[in-house]
Amino acid sequence: MVSLRPLTASDIPRIVELNDAASPAVPITSPQEMAELLDLAGFTFAAVDGDEVQGFLIGMTPGSSYASENYRFFDQRGKEYLYIDRIVIDQTVRGAGIGRTLYTAVFDLARAQGRTEVDCEVNIQPPNPQSLAFHARMGFARVGEQETKGGTVEVALLAAPVPR
């Protein structure tokens, strides 16, 4: 059974390992880049089983200086939102409900903060059909598409209302 806690700097080696194993669904990230991302994050969750991080989620709140093209799309919409920058689950435990547990925590946080939606993006080129299906089950709908990383990646921009 996993429990959730905030990510810490001591988690960086493990989350970089998980992150890079999930490429191309998420970009390869150096330990320094991951530390910078954690510094910018508005919220984080580590899904842990004992001492082992099995998955993680990094998110942003409105008004961050985060330079991501996808984050900027949502920040410019003028909504009260939380943005999920990345979620990664250890490949050996996918399908065990960890993703749903992490997303439930984000929706609970959004509700507690009075937010109206949760936003994220999923690659459509290169394709990530499992993630698109997961997000559809979680209530996300496509609100846009855009090319990023110099046209090498195309994403579906997704939003889900926060249940009251």
Q: Where is each model-derived feature located?
A:
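Conserved acetyl-CoA-binding loop-helix of GNAT-fold acetyltransferases
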Residues: 89, 95-108, 137
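C-terminal "cap" of GNAT-fold acetyltransferases
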Residues: 76, 145-164
